[in-house]
Amino acid sequence: MTLLRPTCIAVAMILAGCTAQAPSAETGAPAPAVADAPPATPAPTPSTLGTEPVLGPQPVAALGVGPDGSPLDPMDEAHAPVAAPDHKANDVATTTGADGVLRAQVLLLRQHFSTGEIDGKAGMNVAKAVRAFQKSHGLTVSGELDDATWAALNQDSAPVLMTYTLTQKDIDGPYAPTPERAEDKAKMDRIVYQTMLEMLGERYNAKPELLQSLNPDADFSKAGATLVVPYTRPAQSLPKAGRIVVDKSDGALQLLDADGKLFAQFPASTGSSKFPLPIGEWKLTSVVQDPDYRYNPDILVGQPKDAKPATLPPGPNGPVGIVWMGINKQHYGIHGTPEPGHISRTQSSGCVRLTNFAAQAVATAVEVGTPVTFQE
């Protein structure tokens, strides 16, 4: 299926969460919200520019995203791995301390069991990724990095840290501060990353502070500078998912195959007491890359009294990030975020929120009609 990047797909966070809709072909204005949930397999609606919503899987992104939030070319030779020299995390014997955690985080991610932003720190997201990996590989499920788990992870022999040379494109961006008010966001062409360091963090699914600690003497403002970064290319592409399962208590999104076997997991933010996750059985109705966002202050909490409705442009720092996957319940879906460090640590407005890195990965494995289970 040919991938189209829609420029006018409006995504609204309405009442309990978010929804994706196509603009009116006659006026170019966002289509009004409807009372009923969208059909399970909606027909594509052309926008004023002749594009259509993306209703199928996206191509695999090799190492995350570029400066404008777009997927990097999987065949880009600039991202071929060259092991970072003399770093303990690249040593298979490293199993403890911060370097051991860093090694585990990268290896888990390459097996599609994400710990969220890679930061070299143990915590709840590491433990639940380890548990899921152990379950999927028939190991004793403990959440601990025991010898058997390390043996399974170390079947992947590629380096966990590689060198990367900054390009002029990396330096040039575009980058821009993200305004606080929606009306100011609406004036932007794209809601891009604020800094190159933020972009690099999302490209390699790493906390920006980790990149700084790995490169204490690097000049991040100079094209040609060599950096040490996590090598996050998956060992294998994700297969087609038979089902998405979002577990509220575990704060995770899982992908299962047609036989119900777990093969991937990503941390997720899954609603709040005010806007709870809609427990039940659903299905995907859309998979939209680069969605716009419809802002309606009348139905959102804590908005300025003088705020007005606005359609915000797409971009990685938009409210729903770079991917929207809608379900057949009005206003609800699975999407990215401008704040990857908050995933699984803060609540959402009813939708399922992933890092942009994770949302893009999930979108490669699903399609319209994929069953979705939201469970306690």
Task: Give the location of each predicted region.
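C-terminal motif of bacterial Sec signal peptides marking the signal peptidase cleavage site
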Residues: L15-G17
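Bacterial signal peptide processing site
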Residues: T19-A22
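Post-signal peptide N-terminal segment of mature Sec-exported envelope proteins
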Residues: S24-A78
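A short amphipathic alpha-helical interaction element
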Residues: T96-S142
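Short alpha-helical segments in extracytoplasmic peptidoglycan/chitin-binding modules
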Residues: A104-L108, D119, A129-Q134, M196-R203, ...
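Extracellular LysM carbohydrate-binding repeats and other cell-envelope/extracellular binding modules
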Residues: M124-K128, A132-D170, Q212-P239, R243
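Gly/Pro-biased beta-strand-loop elements
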Residues: S237-T337
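Exported/periplasmic cell-wall-interacting domains
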Residues: K305-E376
